[in-house]
C-alpha cells in the first residue's frame, strides 16, 4: 500500500470518529463551509466544495493567498524563483491534473547533482555511494515495499530514526555523511530527527528523481491564482485572524480578530499546528489531540536566491550538494531565458538559522565562498539576493512538518481526526510532506469527508 492509500484508509477510519464524547450533532447537509487558511490546501478544499454547490468562505491571516507557495520575481531581469514550495513530482497526479485543467504548463525542473565535500568539487556522475551501500540500500527499499501494511515488522520502522536505521544496517561513515547531507534537504532537519518509517517510505515510493521533476511556468504561484479565481476572490478574506471556533446548536461559529463572525455547517482548518494552537476551541480539543499538536515539529529552512549577471555555471541542469553552510544549490532559472541567472541556496536546520541571522551581503559572501571550489571567484557576478527563512515565519514557525520516531503511526493519525463539525487539513497531514501535492490531497480529503458525512 502506497502512502497515499494509507492516508485514504486512515481518513476513512477516522472520518466518523467525532472525538467529542459528550456532544451530539445532528446530521445536516452542508450548505456553507468556512475554511481557515487560503494556502493551497484550503483553496483545493474550497474548489472541491464549490464544484458541489457548497458556499465557501476562506479566512486568511496573511495579506495574500498561497501560504507557503511564494513566487518572487526579479522584475528588471524578468526572472522568477520560489521562496516556498519548489517541485511538482512525476507522481503528483492531482496537481498535474489541476495544471492541465487550468492551462498551466509544467517545465522540466530536474537536475544532475554535483558534490562539494572537504573543499573538493566533483561533477555529476563522478561521485556516488559505495557499490556495497547501493546494493544494500536497494534491497532495504524492496523489503520495505514487500511488507504488509499494519504488520508488526513494518510498524517497527517507526520506533527508530532514519539515521539509526541505516547505521544498524551497516552503512559506512562516508556513505552516512552523504545520506545526511542529501536526505536532510528532503526533511528540513537532520535525519536523526526523522522516523525511519517516514524516511524509507519517502524513497521507496518516489519517482527516480525523488519527485523533483517539474515546475510551473511563470512560477508556482500561478496555481494559487487560478484556484483563487475559480473559488472566487470575493469569497476570500485576507488579513484576518481567527480567534475562536465555537460549535453549538448543530453549527459552527468562527470569531475573527476584527470583530466579525461567520457561521457554517462545517469548518475546515488548514492552519499549521503553531497557528492552530492559538485558536480558542469551544468545546476544547481533546487531550490526545493537544498532545499530538505539541509533539509535532516543523523544519527550519531558508531559501536564498542570488541573481547573477551571467550564468557562469554553464550547466542549465545544475544542482549541488555541499558540506558548507549554504548546504544545497540549484539553478532556479532553468528554462527561463536570459543572460542573467539565479542560483538558490537551500539550507536546513541549524545551517538555516545561522544564515538567517546574516545580512544580505554576508549571505552572498557565504554562498559565493561555498561555490568557489567549483567555479572560482564568482562574487563579482552577484547582483543581489532575496531570501525567506521559514523558521521564523509568523504563522508557521517552520517550513513543513517533520515526523520523528514514534510519530508517523501515532501523531499523524491522531491529527487526522475531526473535532465534531470541524475537519483538519494541510501539509502536516499529508503523505508527501513539503510538497504541494500532499497539501492538495489533504484539503480535498477533508472536503470529501464533509460531503460524505
Regions found by a protein language model. Give the residues of each.
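FAD-dinucleotide binding site
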Residues: 2-453
